[in-house]
Curated annotation (Swiss-Prot):
Descriptive protein name: Maximins 6/H10
InterPro entries registered for this protein in UniProt: Bombinin
Record's subcellular location: Secreted
UniProt signal peptide: 1-18
UniProt source species: Bombina maxima (Giant fire-bellied toad)
Propeptide: 19-43, 74-123
Keywords annotated in UniProt: Amidation, Amphibian defense peptide, Antibiotic, Antimicrobial, Cleavage on pair of basic residues, Cytolysis, Fungicide, Hemolysis, Secreted, Signal
Length: 144
């Protein structure tokens, strides 16, 4: 009788343990499903906010580019445009991370070329503008 009692109790304990494991697995899978759904919702909201922010920044960058294209840019304006371009590259890299490094390298090379051209331009235009301003100043003194 003791043996039958021990077997019955062992069977009850094993079945209770199996049920608890099964319930744990079900609750974990339900929790995983709920977590996945909430992550999808968060990603959807984040994606919508990111796209809205990107479009707003692109509009701002276009507006600033048009403004600066029509007038002379100061050094501060140039820095602002560089920062905006960097932000736009960062935002684009969020959409396409595999292309980000390629674009960054390409942008660096273009920026390096532009800087060299600007340095050469300054070396040539600086003395020429100085001569023109001296000549105009001399003409104004003679007329006045």
């Amino acid at each position: 009788m003791n043996f039958k009692y021990i077997v019955a109790v062992s069977f009850l304990i094993a079945s209770a343990y199996a049920r608890s494991v099964k319930n744990d697995e079900q609750s974990l899978s339900q929790r995983d499903v709920l977590d996945e759904e909430s992550l999808r919702e968060i990603r959807g909201i984040g994606g919508a906010l990111l796209s809205a922010g990107k479009s707003a920044l692109k509009g701002l960058a276009k507006g600033l580019a048009e403004h600066f294209a029509n007038g002379k840019r100061t050094a501060e304006d140039h820095e602002v445009m560089k920062r905006l371009e960097a932000v736009m590259r960062d935002l684009d890299s969020l959409d396409h991370p595999e292309e980000a490094s390629e674009r960054e390298t390409r942008g660096f090379n273009q920026e390096e070329i532009a800087n060299r051209f600007t340095k050469k331009e300054k070396r040539i235009l600086g003395p020429v503008l100085g001569l023109v301003s001296n000549a105009l100043g001399g003409l104004l003194k003679n007329l006045g």
